[in-house]
Amino acid sequence: MRKARASDCVMLLDELDKLSSGLGVHGDPTAAMLEVLDPEQNHAFKDHYLNVPVDLSRVIFIATANSLDTIPEPLLDRVDTVHVAGYTFDEKVAIAERHLVPKQLDAHGLSNSQVKLSQDVLMHVAQSYTREAGVRTMERRIGDIVRAKAVEYAQSPNTYESTITIGDVERILGGPTYEPEVVDEVGVPGVATGMAYQGSGMGSILHIEC
């Protein structure tokens, strides 16, 4: 609020589900959050460190969480829950092109002309080396590729090849970590195909013996 210079600002509470990890000798942070998010009390929220009341009644709070399982029920009762689906593979590729690749190139001192990652290569990385709703693992894999190319450029600048192929990806990262799941074209007697939804936003195929 001090940085925003406004009492009607928007405040982001990132990873609210991590509050439970602070329980113990350091106090209960969820008790303070209950008071902060309660419209009947937050007009005079008192910070025990500063020992002064703060009016939070005009603040719009937006909280994020990876899982609702570790958030106390009283805290969930004070918020409206909106479930956001994980990124699709196409969205991951778009995010990688616009943000992740430029970020890794800048971090390793390389330019766009020195490391060329096509959409097909990025899609292969997303499908074969990551299995998550977000893009953190994909960013790490892209970082591994860029670092390997930086070493190649430093060691052999005259024979360096800037275009990265799927073969280069598998040489640097190893074989695919995840194989694409497909339904058997020919049914097997006594085996049914099911679908599972994971908390990360991903799905999978299950072969169930009846």
Write out the residue ranges for each language-model feature.
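Flexible glycine-/small-residue-rich
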Residues: 13-17, 63-66, 77, 83-86, ...
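Conserved C-terminal "switch" segment of AAA+ ATPases
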Residues: 2-5, 10, 67-77, 81-143, ...
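Conformational switch/transducer regions in large eukaryotic molecular machines and scaffolds
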Residues: 5, 17, 51, 57, ...
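Conserved catalytic/switch belt of AAA+ P-loop NTPases
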Residues: 15-55, 77
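Hydrophobic aliphatic residues
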Residues: 1, 36-40, 79, 96, ...
